[in-house]
Curated annotation (Swiss-Prot):
UniProt keywords, alphabetically: Cytoplasm, Ethylene signaling pathway, Nucleus, Repeat, Stress response, Translation regulation
Domain MI: 116-237, 280-401, 414-535, 577-697
Species of origin: Arabidopsis thaliana
Keyword Ribosomal protein among record annotations: no
Stretches with biased composition (Basic residues): 53-65
Any one Gene Ontology BP term: ethylene-activated signaling pathway
Stated name of the protein: MA3 DOMAIN-CONTAINING TRANSLATION REGULATORY FACTOR 3
Subunit relationships: Interacts with EIN2, ETR2 and EIN4. Binds to EIF4A1. The association with ribosomes is modulated by cellular energy status and TOR activity.
PROSITE patterns: MI
Compartments, as annotated in UniProt: Nucleus; Cytoplasm, Cytosol
Motif (Nuclear localization signal 2): 615-622
Regions of compositional bias (Basic and acidic residues) in chain numbering: 81-91
């Protein structure tokens, strides 16, 4: 066979063979051969040989050399350059290498960190419900890490407890309070409850009373100070009105947090089976502090605090100790000594210390009613605590807080200036939606009570027209922006300064009583809110007398009708006279059909706050006289020109809705007509979304 080779090819084969013998096994002899073979040059046998040199590679990365007749002995140079496309691996071959067997890559399943967290959280929760050990649960959660997933822990904890007995529900609430600030930050608590509200529709499928139970958890979180009251209205705005989550928020606010003595009722709703009730713990803390102030035995006081076994509630010890120091100047030094010692022994953690100071700072306004110098004294205590090393400097009164306080004062000053302009514009335009937009643009919901105080103060010094507008606005704000607490706090501020107001406005006390009573009639406040307001005022003060007067007005005969007309129509006319004028202009419009003339007459009435009467009478006239299109055209034109606002439209429609049963006695199809009017109003944007929602809810109940 060598006769077929040229001298040059023989030499190349010799070199290749020698090189192959010297190479380690990992290097391939045929690759050396290929380096020495001449490049194809067009045709002939060289070209054919080159085309035949095709190498198959195994999955292991090795070239598989084809063998001829299973061998490749001496002189068989096909061993080096020939390939066999049908090469098969033979396990019985002496040269068999298992690494050349074909194999399949199998993808490994990657674990999801969130899934891992949820599994671990479920284990922690189940163990906690078995043992009731708060400290172990907190330690396990800290050890678990992945703090960004803590909202899911809250969702899991509450959702599991919802389907268990009251004991577990109470345990879940206690654990949430324990984890607050120390383990789970406030934003994560909030996010956890958002997840719960968003899942309320799913909970109802398995837990029939899920809305009520979740509402109670929400109320308990507010009472326990782990959720701010402002969370409720903000959550309600973010949720679809038809969702179960929205119902949860409404139930929490109206059924639990608006009741008299709601905090005590909510705290004891599940019986407190897990441990001593919160009220009992508070009483024990008060007893420990009172005894300590008398004896001055720091070690004994620390021992008693430790024996309470409520490390998650030590912020209450801090808060009550500080209140004691503010109330009794002689107690300040021993109280600070006690807190210093408790911090040094790690009895009270840094986060619990900060939380206690924060809670006191938030209640300074209320404390100032009984302790006028509370804010000043607290401002002196904070630097001592920070310099003593037992209050985190981030709390910040010495330096940062001073700057923040100045910024806060500046913000409040600007707010007061801006709202005066906004209120004046409202008195001129009666445009409630525009006022609400302006107030939202200020972005300071924490100052809502201040706005209410300024609104009524300005109205007091004006005519009945503006007083009626102020009451109407207050009702709208309560629907759109203000919480009941905002309104109550605003009236407290008004009544605290009632004596000063009376110096400028002689009848201020009587008119404030009317505003307060009117707020109750308009469902802005509940009657029991008057008791809460009175409890925050100095006994036997002008403010408490005003509240008593308001209460007597509310419970008088025909109080509702009288209070709704308490401002007499605003421009000095009797309400009945105003109604007659409105009836006359509508009848004239019915005869003439002149929309522009009717709008002119409405404008000349000069009673924008009473335009809901125009809406009501127009709708009723449309039903009675089958003048639907004519009356709807008038209302549309009035709305387009800005004569009748959304608020007045809504109020007019509401009044017609409330009187439908009586109307149906004379107009059998009154309800059908009214529904048609509502659809028309909805299409043209006349009425508020809250009104449409109330109609939907009433229909569902019916």
């Amino acid at each position: 066979m060598e006769g077929f080779l040229t001298d040059q090819q023989r030499e190349m084969m010799k070199v290749a063979t020698q090189t192959a013998d010297d190479l380690p096994p990992s290097q391939k002899p045929h690759s050396v051969l290929l380096e020495h073979l001449p490049k194809p040059s067009g045709g002939g046998k060289a070209s054919g040989a080159s085309n035949a040199v095709k190498h198959r590679r195994s999955h292991a990365g090795r070239s598989i050399r084809s063998k001829k007749d299973g061998g490749g002995g001496k002189g068989n140079w096909g061993k080096l350059i020939d390939t066999d496309g049908d090469y098969h691996i033979d396990p019985n071959d002496p040269n068999y290498d298992s690494g050349e067997e074909p194999f399949e890559l199998v993808g490994a399943t990657l674990s999801d960190p969130l899934d891992d967290y949820k599994k671990a959280a479920a284990s922690i929760i189940n163990e906690y419900f078995s043992t009731g050990d708060v400290d172990v649960a907190a330690a396990d959660l800290i050890e678990l890490g992945s703090s960004e997933y803590h909202p899911y822990f809250i969702k899991r904890l509450v959702s599991v407890a919802m389907d268990r007995h009251d004991k577990e529900k109470e345990m879940a609430s206690v654990l949430l309070s324990a984890l607050y600030a120390d383990v789970i930050n406030p934003n994560q608590i909030r996010d956890g409850f958002v997840l719960l509200l968003e899942s309320a529709d799913d909970f109802v499928v398995d837990i029939p009373d899920a809305v009520n139970v979740l509402a109670l958890f929400l109320a308990r979180a507010v009472v326990d100070d782990i959720l701010p009251p402002a969370f409720l209205p903000r959550a309600a705005k973010a949720l679809p009105i038809t969702s179960k989550g929205y119902q949860v928020v409404q139930t929490a606010e109206k059924s639990y947090l608006s009741a008299a003595h709601h905090a005590e009722l909510v705290e004891r709703r599940w019986g407190g089976q897990t441990r001593t009730t919160v009220e009992e713990v508070k009483k024990k803390i008060a007893d420990i502090l009172n005894e300590y102030v008398e004896t001055g035995e720091t070690y004994e006081a620390c021992r008693c605090v430790r024996e309470l076994g409520v490390s998650f509630f030590h912020h209450e010890v801090v808060k009550r100790a500080l209140v004691t120091a503010l109330e009794n100047h002689a107690a300040e030094a021993p109280v600070l000594k006690l807190l210093n010692e408790a911090a040094s022994e790690n009895l009270i953690s840094s986060s619990q210390m900060v939380k206690g100071f924060s809670r006191l700072r938030e209640s300074l306004d209320d404390l100032a009613l009984d302790i006028p110098s509370a804010r000043t004294k607290f401002g002196l205590i904070v630097p001592k605590a920070v310099s003593g090393g037992w209050l985190d400097a981030s709390f910040g009164y010495p330096s940062g807080e001073c700057g923040r306080q100045q910024n806060e004062d500046e913000k409040l000053k600007r707010f007061k200036e801006d709202i005066v302009t906004i209120i004046h514009e409202y008195f001129n335009s009666d445009d409630i939606p525009e006022l609400i937009r302006s107030l939202e643009d200020l972005g300071a919901p924490e100052y809502n009570p201040i706005f209410l105080k300024k609104l009524i103060t300005l109205a007091l010094d004006r005519k009945n027209h503006e007083k009626e507008m102020a009451s109407v606005l207050l009702s709208s704000l309560h629907i759109e922006m203000f919480t009941t607490e905002d309104v109550a706090d605003g009236f407290v501020m008004l009544l605290e300064s009632a004596e000063d107001t009376a110096l400028d406005i002689l009848d201020a006390s009587n008119e404030l009583a009317l505003f307060l009573a009117r707020a109750v009639i308009d469902d802005v406040l509940a009657p029991f809110n008057l008791e809460e307001i009175s409890s925050k005022l100095r006994p036997n003060s002008s403010g408490t007398e005003t509240v008593k007067m308001a209460r007597s007005l509310i419970f008088a005969r025909h109080a509702g009708e009288r209070l709704l007309r308490c401002w007499g129509g605003g421009s000095g006319w009797a309400v009945e006279d105003a109604k007659d004028k409105i009836s006359n202009l509508l009848e004239e419009y019915e005869s003439s059909g002149l929309v522009s003339e009717a709008c002119k007459c409405i404008h000349e009435l000069g009673m924008p706050f009473f335009n809901h009467e125009v809406v009501k009478k127009a709708l009723v006239m449309g039903m009675e006289k089958k003048k639907d299109k004519m009356m709807l055209d008038l209302l549309q034109e009035s709305f387009s020109e800005g004569l009748i606002t959304t608020n007045q439209m809504t109020k007019g429609f509401t009044r017609v809705k409330d009187g439908l049963e009586d109307l149906a006695l004379d107009i059998p199809n009154a309800k059908e007509k009214f529904n048609d009017y509502v659809e028309y109003g909805k299409k043209n944007g006349w009425v508020s979304s809250s009104f449409l929602t109330s109609l939907t809810e009433d229909a569902n109940v019916g």
